[in-house]
Amino acid sequence: MGKKHRNRITGQKKNNHIPEKDIIAAEEAHGKEYSAAKRKP
């Protein structure tokens, strides 16, 4: 369990090195996910 948590933290640190393009794409995907969840109920 502890290892999983540590990996998640290092993953967040790595995000700083991802190009802006990828971050924007990830944000768009999250937005679609959120609106889909809104639509469900």
From Swiss-Prot:
Gene: yoyE
Region Disordered: start-end pairs: 1-41
UniProt-recorded name of the protein: Uncharacterized protein YoyE
Lineage top rank: taxon: Bacteria
Compositional bias (Basic and acidic residues): 17-41
Organism: Bacillus subtilis (strain 168)
